[in-house]
Amino acid sequence: MKQARRLHHIFDLKRDERLSAIGDGLEHLGTHIEQLMASIEQLLRKGQKSAAGALQAICLEESAKVLILLDITRTHDQRIARKGCDYFYSHLPRLIYAKVHSSNPADFGEIEGYLTWLRPSHYLDGPNDVDWIWRNELLRTRENALYVDYEETDDGYMWTGGDPDQFYIETAATRLVLAMKRAGLLTERGARAAAAAWKVAEFDSGTRWEFCRDKAREVLEAALPSDTVPSESLRDDVHLILEKWTFPLLSLDLKEEPVSMETLKERQDRYLSRQYGTDDYY
């Protein structure tokens, strides 16, 4: 029997069944991420940094899928929530999810601002901010961790990727998701708690991060059994969740923004014209 990717099918289910299906998915992902992390730690102990980096890249995107599923439960406008199914299967939206949750945005507007530099397919950088043309940094880092390739650069053609000294995989989103697992959020009960806490939540560009912290506290109080005696490690997990679990992102456009090489080269030429007065020769 053909097994096709069908996350969109959850929107054909009644709300109660949908939350149950999401809870099941959260549990599967949580277990998978935990196992990946155990393998990563074993590889690092053996000094196999390249293999560990490749698994870290996979683990990061699996962690982002957890955050996307939770956002589907936290987003009650179904038209917006459905976007989560597209983001669930796309590399860049998943990487943006991970990047946002590794930062400390003061408000929702700051997250909106992040997208101006996280989404473009190519960008200019260098000592003068226009010296070199780079591919999207998030995608480039992912590919360098997973693949070896022969690429054209401003310095000519060269082999890239596979060298752990040439890339860094941010693990903050994975740490957050594992904390959520230990706190009982990656369950059907956790999915229902998230949905209930955010049911009438409204926010805009000026909404402060403390709004998310208070909502996260509501979710934790509903998800954890009332007789839970918090250990020191659980307190650490709760603190991390309260600090790092930010706004739902499904209302934002997280897809790659195409930027042509011609456009960037024109910007380089304009800079050179202004800087060195080359216009005077024409």
Specify the residue positions occupied by each region the protein language model found.
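Long, charged low-complexity segments
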Residues: 1-23, 28, 75-282
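Start-of-helix signal in alpha-solenoid helical-repeat scaffolds, especially tetratricopeptide repeats
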Residues: 26, 33-34, 57, 143
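Amphipathic, well-ordered alpha-helical segments in soluble domains
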Residues: 32-36, 62, 141
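Conserved small-residue packing positions in alpha-helical repeats and bundles
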Residues: 40, 64, 143-145
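Hydrophobic/aromatic side-chain positions at a characteristic register within alpha-helices
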Residues: 37, 44-45
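Short, charge-rich amphipathic alpha-helical segments embedded
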Residues: 49-78
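Short, hydrophobic/aromatic alpha-helical segments in well-folded domains
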Residues: 36-39, 55
